[in-house]
Amino acid sequence: MNDRQPPATYTIGLVQMAMSPDPDQNLRTAVAKVGEAAAAGARLVCLPELFRSQYFAQREDAALFDLAEPVPGPSTEALGRAAKQAGVVVIAPVFERRAPGLYHNSAAVIDADGSLVGLYRKMHVPDDPAYYEKFYFAPGDLGFRVFDTRVGRIGTLVCWDQWYPEGARLTALQGAHILLYPTAIGWHPVEKATHGAAQLDAWQTIQRSHAIANGVYVAAVNRVGHERPNATADGIEFWGSSFLADPFGAVVAQAPADRDAVVVHEVNLARIEEARRGWPFLRDRRIDAYAGLSKRFLDEAPSAISNQPSAKTRNSDR
């Protein structure tokens, strides 16, 4: 645990980048972008999901497991040196090789002294056309976590986790003042004309809602560029648009949709107190009535009824 008093304000850097086919080049670019963000004043820098490679989960190919690395490993060591040199906290998403045949989509948290604070393993793993992640990644088994760093207590989740309010809530309830979502998301080119705007809006809206519901900052950090797994495939056009939302859900900084960018913006912890005083959602939660959330689906009426507060409980709240 970091014993220093966290700052009341600091600057965050969101690194949006296109990935080349060369993992070593991508790592060099990431290190340079960390330095660029730090030079612009950032004290916390987040990289995109699986930044070391192009998005390989567009196809199922066992040879691509060779892209994985241990933690600690080459990526965390290089970024640890960069973090220490620049004095910044770094979120480093990696394809983690945990053991032979066991892999995770993970995010390492590196403190400003270069030390590895901890690791988050992606909890929600998709299996959709061109997002065949279940072939590669075991679901996370570390739970939703927070990390004490030089900039205070932060939480990181990964990409598909951003669609689930439960993960955001459980992370915020542990005291995180910011939720970071390193991401790899984009359009199927054939759908862009008809659904593209709605898909991008939904992606931003769900994460803004996490900021509002929990009274925290939310940062989504995406890759950019059109990646094809082979010469004939349509591939994915990653939509960039990395952004920071404040505790009121306002988008206060955003990257373009079509190019690399390092976006920096102030995080002010006083805004959290301001938001939660005006919108006391944490105060008004009915934790006695949410048992049904631990079930896959409430198929039977008696099960649903059993999760309602009793008359005695209701009377005690008056």
Annotate each predicted stretch with a short phrase.
Residues 9-21, 106, 119-122, 146, ...:
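Active-site-proximal beta-strand elements of phosphoester/diester hydrolases
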Residues 106, 119-122, 241, 254, ...:
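Residue-level detector of high-confidence beta-strand sites
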Residues 12, 109-117, 243-252:
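Short, glycine-anchored, charge-dense loop/turn motifs used at functional sites
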Residues 122-136, 259-276:
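A short, polar/charged loop-to-alpha-helix boundary motif
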Residues 23, 32-113, 117-119, 185-209, ...:
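Cys-nucleophile CN-hydrolase/nitrilase-fold catalytic domain and related Cys-dependent amidase chemistry
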Residues 1-4, 301-318:
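Short, basic, low-complexity termini and linkers enriched in Ser/Thr/Gly/Pro
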Residues 144-177, 183, 272-303:
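Cysteine/selenocysteine-centered motifs that mediate thiol-based redox chemistry or coordinate metal-sulfur cofactors
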Residues 68-91, 159-262:
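CN hydrolase (nitrilase-like) catalytic-core segments centered on the catalytic cysteine
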